[in-house]
Amino acid sequence: MPINIPNGLPAASVLAGEQIFVMTEERATHQDIRPLTLLFLNLMPKKIATEIQYMRKLSNTPLQVNIDLLRVDKHISKNTPQPHLDTFYKDFEEIEGRNYDGMIITGAPLDQIDFSDVTYWDKLEKIITWSKEHVTSTLFSCWGVAAGLKIFYDLPLINRKEKLSGVFLHHTAQSLNPLIRGFDDTFLAPHSRFIDFPSDVIRKHTDLEILADSEITGMFLAATPDRRQVFVTGHPEYDATTLSDEYRRDLAAGKDPKLPENYFPHDDPTQIPSCVWRSHASLLFGNWLNYYVYQITPYKW
């Protein structure tokens, strides 16, 4: 089934070129089934690229999905054209009185900044707190996970000595939780973060069920018992070359980054990496939409 996104959004032409079923708003209005409505809080600097990555994953299910794009504030972006933000993104005040079937809160390049020093922290805290009453299930990603854990469990930011960057093997929990239904016992996923999410700390201080982790990455996937919050510390939405792009960006900035682990063929950055996490990424987002959103959300709010 298709994903329904706003007319004119750049992601529409990109996805259509990849033969991904994208439905126009006009056509969607003639569908008799009730579509899911998701709120997408995009905290990443390169918003268009992030939109495309997530929408690829959200489109690969039998469910029709409508997307509302949300920005946390109106600051002038250095990486996204202002007309794009003004055209496609809503402010929180516009949607505060609505309810949503699902919500995604992306990561942000704020790993080494205290929450109190994040300029939009108060607004973000308000949005995340609001989501508990107005969203059936919210999926947090990377830095968004740290923000959610701070707000819901008062967990402080834990930083690693070195950035975790690369593609790592994870172990799936022996659980009947439908979020990992169909997962292999082990699977690969990319990470790109300074934040640490030790599994033992998460188990000790929260009620989360850890559904996948590894000794290297710590917790990768966890959920609350009521399925209302999902936490994904990696970046299953990433394209094959995203880690490469980040590595070259940091090189150009003089940061002397480490080579992403288990990523470039023969650890040679001149070679093109493969995407070896695509199938499990699609399964994760499909399971979330089906079992945590569609099967739980009320037909009428």
Swiss-Prot record:
NCBIfam families: metA. The record marks 192 as: Important for substrate specificity. This is Homoserine O-acetyltransferase. The gene is metAA. The record marks 111 as: Important for acyl-CoA specificity. Pathway: Amino-acid biosynthesis; L-methionine biosynthesis via de novo pathway; O-acetyl-L-homoserine from L-homoserine: step 1/1. It comes from Succinatimonas hippei (strain DSM 22608 / JCM 16073 / KCTC 15190 / YIT 12066). It catalyses: L-homoserine + acetyl-CoA = O-acetyl-L-homoserine + CoA. The lineage of its organism: Bacteria, Pseudomonadati, Pseudomonadota, Gammaproteobacteria, Aeromonadales. InterPro entries: Class_I_gatase-like, HST_MetA, MetA_family. Substrate binds at residues 163, 192, 249. PANTHER family: HOMOSERINE O-SUCCINYLTRANSFERASE.
